[in-house]
Amino acid sequence: MTATQYMPYLDVYVSENYNVLSRIVWSYDSSGVQSKKMFGSLYEPILMCTKNKNSKYTFNYNDIMIEAKTGSQRKLIDYRKKVPAPYNTKKVPGNVWNFNRVRFKMDEYENHPTQKPEALLERIVLASSNKDDIVLDPFSGTFTTSSVAIKNGRKAIGMELNDEYYKIGIRRTGISNTYQDEKLQKDKSRKTNNRSKRSTITVSSKVDQIQLSLGDEFAWEILLKIF
């Protein structure tokens, strides 16, 4: 099952145990593999939630403002105000986000079948964290979240099962350009197999890093304690 198919079940669980603030749709321009038996999926769901209704959370709306569609690029004046002023041409994004999927020829492409675009994760990181905060991604893939977090002055904790993706992570986060005497370079080949026998936790910032290899059960135990 895909993330889109799982979401109804996850939504019910999260709604019963947490406080859902927003249900976001990431809309993209291609469904990838074309099916002749059903409609192709052109979106992925995202839940924004807190532990409970009393939880304090960060929402930096000023850091994620986008251009408001006014129908014209000229300066518009709002005469409804006591002192006429230019219309605000910026607005907070709604809950439907349009970002293209990562394609093979893009500079940010890494060898992963479901890589998320940096622009998508940057919006989430900027909105929900402040500088020097720690951003956790327990299913890191190519470590785009961690990479974006560090670029924007945050620290990052990334967790990943696959050794090859882990190598991508330590390269993208700037921890090292080598791994066990292997020089790490971007691989521009097509998608890899998404499996591994071990978990790796990486804690990284600009000045320090910790790397731990863990068994799957222990990794999940840590996740449960974190959340």
Predicted regions and their residues:
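PRPP-dependent phosphoribosyltransferase catalytic core
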Residues: 167-227
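Core catalytic lobe of class I
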Residues: 1-168, 214, 219, 223
